[in-house]
Amino acid sequence: MSQEYIEDKEVTLTKLSSGRRLLEALLILIVLFAVWLMAALLSFNPSDPSWSQTAWHEPIHNLGGMPGAWLADTLFFIFGVMAYTIPVIIVGGCWFAWRHQSSDEYIDYFAVSLRIIGVLALILTSCGLAAINADDIWYFASGGVIGSLLSTTLQPLLHSSGGTIALLCVWAAGLTLFTGWSWVTIAEKLGGWILNILTFASNRTRRDDTWVDEDEYEDDEEYEDENHGKQHESRRARILRGALARRKRLAEKFINPMGRQTDAALFSGKRMDDDEEITYTARGVAADPDDVLFSGNRATQPEYDEYDPLLNGAPITEPVAVAAAATTATQSWAAPVEPVTQTPPVASVDVPPAQPTVAWQPVPGPQTGEPVIAPAPEGYPQQSQYAQPAVQYNEPLQQPVQPQQPYYAPAAEQPAQQPYYAPAPEQPVAGNAWQAEEQQSTFAPQSTYQTEQTYQQPAAQEPLYQQPQPVEQQPVVEPEPVVEETKPARPPLYYFEEVEEKRAREREQLAAWYQPIPEPVKEPEPIKSSLKAPSVAAVPPVEAAAAVSPLASGVKKATLATGAAATVAAPVFSLANSGGPRPQVKEGIGPQLPRPKRIRVPTRRELASYGIKLPSQRAAEEKAREAQRNQYDSGDQYNDDEIDAMQQDELARQFAQTQQQRYGEQYQHDVPVNAEDADAAAEAELARQFAQTQQQRYSGEQPAGANPFSLDDFEFSPMKALLDDGPHEPLFTPIVEPVQQPQQPVAPQQQYQQPQQPVPPQPQYQQPQQPVAPQPQYQQPQQPVAPQQQYQQPQQPVAPQQQYQQPQQPVAPQPQDTLLHPLLMRNGDSRPLHKPTTPLPSLDLLTPPPSEVEPVDTFALEQMARLVEARLADFRIKADVVNYSPGPVITRFELNLAPGVKAARISNLSRDLARSLSTVAVRVVEVIPGKPYVGLELPNKKRQTVYLREVLDNAKFRDNPSPLTVVLGKDIAGEPVVADLAKMPHLLVAGTTGSGKSVGVNAMILSMLYKAQPEDVRFIMIDPKMLELSVYEGIPHLLTEVVTDMKDAANALRWCVNEMERRYKLMSALGVRNLAGYNEKIAEADRMMRPIPDPYWKPGDSMDAQHPVLKKEPYIVVLVDEFADLMMTVGKKVEELIARLAQKARAAGIHLVLATQRPSVDVITGLIKANIPTRIAFTVSSKIDSRTILDQAGAESLLGMGDMLYSGPNSTLPVRVHGAFVRDQEVHAVVQDWKARGRPQYVDGITSDSESEGGAGGFDGAEELDPLFDQAVQFVTEKRKASISGVQRQFRIGYNRAARIIEQMEAQGIVSEQGHNGNREVLAPPPFD
């Protein structure tokens, strides 16, 4: 070994030059600056003084102090998130400079310029990628100014995805320019790392210790002892020496075949230059090493390494070779053989070998009485020459049983090669008697023959490992000496230079393996040194004297076909042209060695054609036997309860028929039946008799050999399993057409079978009194029932019910004669409902709130308070959070502003605060009543639902005596908000679609339904959308049906105006000021038993014979769901009616609730707003809409889903309320409860206008005419010119009033409609002089 270099480990202190000292000192300072810069970047706080802001009132939070805060702010502003990489780049540059400080190479300025270009490309593209794909950091752009410029430039041109791809390409080019690395090299490095990781992982999972011999450790110890004195030997030399030693030992193993027998595993136990070794199965057929039929496990394992998958020297055909060695030794007299290589015999021992790990399960096949020839046991000694004794048959043997298919398959072109062999005669010489039995039981793929005495199993045969083995005495036999074959030494084959040569030679030899070469039948001749498998053609099958079973007629054909096929295919297993080796290699282990020919597994059809049965065929045979045993049954299996029920049903029917014959046709088994049922029963009886006749006819005409599953001539094939040659039932059977019953939609088809053939119940259309269900007619009793053979006719009329009723079973309820679906709403349904006993609906109809309430997280609120202070400090606003009020939806933070800070500054920053706090919306409350703080309302992370039941079940609602009490929801503190509609007195509701406006209106209606009786409160509901308020149709509180027509809505409002005038007259007569005082007077008169007569009644006003008396007047609530649609459709007339009601209707007990989703000034005019002070604003789209409703902003910042601002009466500050949620099921439940209490008593004439002319807009001319109308008519008829401007100038009135007068003239027919030029014609004649 050459002398190795030994590194000196001693370190000496050497002085640096002046330039080197200065350079290293400078590098140390730069590294310290990079560390300081990283600390400043990581501890950046927006509230610190920096380049982007100057006002600050807090101590500096940055670890770098004020310079660090300034520098960090500047870097973040320029580079964004890429600023964090700047300290890392600085440290990397210092390391590079320190490593290359001693190199005095020539400076390539072109390379330096390319590196500079690459650095610039990397910086720009990194910032651009961060700006496009990363989130912003603090209040800086994620890519800084550079990334913002690039992203704004690329996005209009390439979009975000295209810009990202373009920047990635430029970044890759910049990396190549800066580093000089090729992307091919980078890809190779990445691939190498991945492969190293996968290799390491796979090596860790594989048992590598099995590949190392025990001798290696000893050899390593020897090497260590030898080289113990070499203390300074390098690690590389030791690894190289170990590798050379392993290679040397591996080569020695290949040279020495007795060491580890590696060639036995790689080349099927043979060398390339050896003669062919012939291995036999237990039946004398040569075993293919790659044959899956004969590649079973060994009975015994050699003393080799059991964990070595490659070098254990055990071929897969060793069990077959051992069996063949013993078999050929005893069958030397059977037939002439050819010389082959001698195989060492297996020594006999007293104790039989253990059972193999894989036990083969024999497949039961058709039994036959023909004896077949079994191979001789292995322990029998060989006989000289060919002196064959007389064959003695003690017991007839059975046909070979095919092993179970899933374990293996035959590995030849012809699937079934199962020849018959002559049985071995009884020998007086005792050998290894147990070997024959063990060979037959253990190696089931080669030979599984048993006598009839042993084969005492039914059709479902037990596995082989469960069968009892015959116990025989085992005579002691001296083991024969093992003869080891001395093979010539040769160089090892496991060298890579011989692979191509071996592969070419092996391809030629393997191609000649499976060439079918017919062998002539040879005469017996003297035995040579080895054995040969006997020819199948030389041993014909012998007829047995035993009785042939009834199944032999069908099996015989398959048996003869199998024997013939085996005779033809016998050369497939012959050993002609088998002089070359048969290598057995493992794929993926070692080099690419010659591979054997792929084996084609026979198909199911090929196996079945030669009589080889599969597990599915055995199951089919089993089913066929069961079908033959149960050929007179219905073919379907039922449980005991179903069979008992059907038997009881049939007995009941027979009993009813007997009683009818005895007592007449009127007897119905103690159950009265109407005439229609009697006719249906008669038709059913005729259908049953007809079915029974057809069944007898088909069962009598069944031919003798029509049974397709008879086992007499059974020959199974995969195609026959799908066919059925037996008679089938007809597809269309004539059925007696029943009488159509008008009240029953469809009755199930009743099929009457014989008593011994019960039918299953059908779950689809089963009736309670009829447990049986349709069954295919004309069922063949001897034919097995299959699901595809049961045909039903959905297009034919259905048979009626049975002719009798069973008393113990309830009768099916008849459906109601209606065409309405049960899921459709029945408005005005007359079905009787159960009347509740309580005066008002129960709260159980509403959804209860959850019992567990999520606690308030005070720690999270404290964190949010600190964050609010920090965000306000970012906008140069000094404020402290002094308190917070958590609610179900939002949390209000009370801010104590610094002196001199205006609340308007925070209000203008509401959207910026929402963005910086990452919330949906922020509402600023400039004035909190009773507190000197400013409120900041933020939404909660987990929003809670406000249930209507928990608001109604409150003392504020229960203790309020007003029948017009309504609940709105909860405020921000979680307290319920209850209002009185009588004090409002009118309500205006506005909100966009989906804001919860309709849900809020439903909550108000339900709260009044839970508070008032129909005699206290009545409703007039106007629903132009025909969706929201139509669900209340039919409740007793309605004065009229829900109004959906716009003209009817105008008439309803006019009726309200007339009712208001009538009530004012009555109140003035009684001397009261409001409806409550009027009702008190009426109640007092009732207590005095002196009712008050109507003072304004005249005898011609009504048909009453007596003078009517005054009664209690209820409150009237007019609800308009979509006020804007009503205004746009009918026009300004509705505005006048609403304005009159809003002005005067409060004292008369008439209240308006107007809801709209378009809060514009042309819908909510100043006249309406002036008379409706109470308003509720849900989420609106803009501040303008918020000011239209509330006269102030704030509604645009609501969260939606019931979040509202409630401006109560006599108050200018709105209260934020979270509306109660009402489900549709709750609304329907309350409505149904009130419908069950009584019907509504509608008032006639509310939606009709009998005094107006058609199409006149529904105006009452006597009451709605202008005071100047008569004078204007006289003026127009005299001048014969109708114009708005003329009337305006003549009477000196406004334009709107003049236009109204002209429209009234048009309505009265005085003037015509406006023409295309704007002129009108005067239709009335001129006045008389």
From Swiss-Prot:
The annotated region (Linker) lies at 184-817
Biased composition range(s): Polar residues: 437-448, 690-699
Any idea where the FtsK domain is? 974-1187
Cite the residue spans of the region called Gamma.
Answer: 1259-1329
Q: Which gene encodes it?
A: ftsK
**Classification via Gene3D superfamilies:** 3.30.980.40, P-loop containing nucleotide triphosphate hydrolases, Winged helix-like DNA-binding domain superfamily/Winged helix DNA-binding domain
Alpha as annotated region, ranges: 818-943
Q: What is this protein called?
A: DNA translocase FtsK
Q: Where is the composition biased (Basic and acidic residues)?
A: 619-628
User: Which segments carry the region annotation Disordered?
Assistant: 351-386, 434-489, 577-596, 604-639, 688-712, 741-849
Keyword Transmembrane among record annotations: yes
Q: Which residues lie on this side of the membrane: Periplasmic?
A: 45-74, 133-162
Q: Transmembrane helix among the record's keywords?
A: yes
Entry's free-text remark on domains? Consists of an N-terminal domain, which is sufficient for the localization to the septal ring and is required for cell division, followed by a linker domain, and a C-terminal domain, which forms the translocation motor involved in chromosome segregation. The C-terminal domain can be further subdivided into alpha, beta and gamma subdomains. The alpha and beta subdomains multimerise to produce a hexameric ring, contain the nucleotide binding motif and form the DNA pump.
